[in-house]
């Protein structure tokens, strides 16, 4: 029995240590509204859309998604070629009403949530990340489909 308890303790400690070592992409010190406006300016200059990955360093699924999209070469290229991608910090205990209004009440979906903004900064899609999940991670095909379907070229193809 002691061996089982010890093995479980080691497994829990290992999982916690792995989570603690993941990159922390959310900057808790910057103004998220100013961050979004800067990203929109960059999108206008580069002909891209903006993806705001809203969440926090406190959120294991947010960190998993960040790791997933950067470690998969195809997804990383799809994102970098088509989007200005930012991590918008949302405090664990809730953030500003202004940010919620700016990004169409995103918190109703849980975290992370991806908000796609067009080149003018208007939210055009909110992606509930639970639809991209598979098991204890994310599904590559669903994630690629999301990013492909919301590129500027795809959305504006009939204009």
Q: What are the roles of these predicted feature ranges?
A:
Residues 1-4:
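Positively charged n-region of N-terminal signal peptides that target proteins for export
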Residues 50-52, 85, 114:
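Hydrophobic beta-strand anchors of alpha/beta hydrolase catalytic cores
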Residues 109-158:
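Non-catalytic, surface beta->alpha helical segment in thiol-disulfide oxidoreductase systems
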Residues 38-71, 75:
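Local sequence-structure signature of Cys/Sec-based thiol-disulfide redox active-site neighborhoods
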Residues 7-16:
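Bacterial N-terminal signal peptides
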Residues 21-46, 155:
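N-terminal leader/targeting and pre-domain segments
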Residues 91-110, 120:
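Structural alpha/beta surface segment adjacent to cysteine/selenocysteine redox centers
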